[in-house]
């Protein structure tokens, strides 16, 4: 990269000490009023002042109960986020992989702070439904976040693809790539939307305890960011959902993530069986024949793993101090992460999938008895 400070002495990693400060003040207000027997109103506002920037962000929420077991809720508000001190002033260097014109290589990647970053603002909207009974609870929420000046880190690959000879690219006298310099920037416009889903049910097993089931999931509809390759004078937004996004200033965005939890509680014992699912997505990198013969394709498969856990009392150590044990098998069936062609990097998506396989977790907990 093109860091010219102390961190320039490092290649595989490093950075520099930062000595910066700023003043921050904030005030928060919240009030709630029942308008009618079944209609509630909540108003909130937050004022923040950070150095020369300030913002007043209100939020209004309404909840309506057409019957005892059903609640409809809607809210709308704004938010204000200052860039962190690290995003503005820090610098660091690491070794990373990029794909240049003539192949894939590891090069020095420098990331420097941007003191000219502006605060990010957003408008947040939510509409949801809740059903709640003695043994069932169901909720679904549609949400949308409309960002302005969202703070994002530049992607070395996106910088290289946009301008292979640009000012952020360092090459030697032979034209070989040796470094890429990135920073943080304000993304002009970002629009994100999706739904959150939750379901809970309790089974009463009488003398055999209780069985609890829970399902929680998120599904993205949109993750729109500017298309850097567009020649249009107006901002063109592209949906990044369901893609690896190797050539953009973001990361892989699977559409669906779903977790389920099954828990059996009997006296002082507890057994859990969980499932974690991540949906498939597309990799737009060109797959060479040599990689295709090894099983790589443009599709990154879905990922489903199971966990098993046990909690049990071990005994009383002394006086009123008890010892409990917790044992868990993470990724019970030793599922490998889906293949991802991203040469010369790893063969899996480091941001999405866990490559560690089956793991045993053992914990002991001391507690005071009543």
Where are these regions (language model features)?
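Transmembrane beta-strands of outer-membrane beta-barrel pores
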Residues: 1-5, 45-51, 76-82, 91, ...
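Outer-membrane beta-barrel transmembrane domain signature of Gram-negative proteins
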Residues: 1-42, 228-259, 274
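Residue-level signature of outer-membrane beta-barrel architecture
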Residues: 29-34, 39, 62-65, 78, ...
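Outer-membrane beta-barrel signature, preferentially recognizing the C-terminal barrel domain
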Residues: 70, 82-141, 145-146, 172-196, ...
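Gram-negative outer-membrane beta-barrel transporters
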Residues: 143-148, 154-285
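C-terminal beta-signal and adjacent terminal beta-strands/loops
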Residues: 221, 276-288, 312-370
């Amino acid at each position: 990269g093109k860091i010219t400070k102390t961190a320039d002495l490092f290649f595989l990693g490093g950075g520099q000490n930062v000595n910066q400060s700023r003043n921050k003040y904030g005030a928060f207000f919240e009030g709630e009023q029942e308008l009618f027997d079944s209609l509630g109103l909540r108003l909130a506002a937050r004022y923040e002042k950070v150095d020369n920037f300030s913002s007043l962000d209100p939020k209004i929420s309404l909840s309506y109960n057409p019957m005892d077991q059903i609640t409809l809720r809607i809210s709308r508000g704004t938010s204000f986020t200052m860039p962190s001190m690290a995003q503005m002033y820090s610098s660091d260097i690491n070794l990373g992989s990029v794909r240049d014109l003539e192949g894939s290589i590891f090069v020095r990647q420098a990331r420097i702070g941007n003191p000219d970053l502006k605060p990010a603002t957003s408008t947040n909207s939510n509409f949801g439904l809740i059903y709640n009974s003695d043994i069932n609870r169901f909720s679904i929420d549609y949400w949308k976040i409309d960002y302005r000046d969202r703070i994002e880190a530049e992607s070395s690959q996106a910088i290289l693809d946009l301008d292979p000879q640009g000012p952020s690219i360092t090459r030697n006298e032979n034209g070989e790539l040796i470094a890429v310099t990135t920073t943080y920037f304000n993304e002009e416009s970002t629009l994100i939307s999706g739904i959150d889903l939750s379901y809970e049910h309790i089974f009463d097993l009488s003398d055999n305890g209780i069985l609890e089931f829970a399902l929680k999931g998120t599904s993205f509809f949109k993750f729109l960011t500017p298309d850097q390759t567009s020649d249009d004078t107006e901002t063109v937004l592209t949906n990044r959902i369901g893609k690896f996004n190797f050539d953009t200033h973001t990361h892989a965005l699977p559409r669906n993530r779903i977790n389920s939890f099954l828990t059996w509680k009997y006296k002082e014992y507890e057994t859990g069986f969980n499932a974690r699912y991540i949906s498939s997505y597309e990799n737009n990198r060109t797959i060479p024949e040599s990689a295709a013969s090894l099983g790589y394709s443009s599709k990154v498969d879905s990922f489903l793993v199971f966990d098993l856990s046990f909690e049990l009392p071990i005994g009383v150590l002394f006086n009123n101090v008890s010892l409990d044990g917790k044992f868990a098998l993470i990724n019970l069936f030793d599922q490998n992460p889906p293949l991802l062609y991203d040469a010369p990097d790893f063969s899996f998506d480091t941001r999405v999938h866990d490559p560690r396989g089956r793991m045993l977790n053992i914990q002991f907990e001391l507690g005071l008895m009543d």
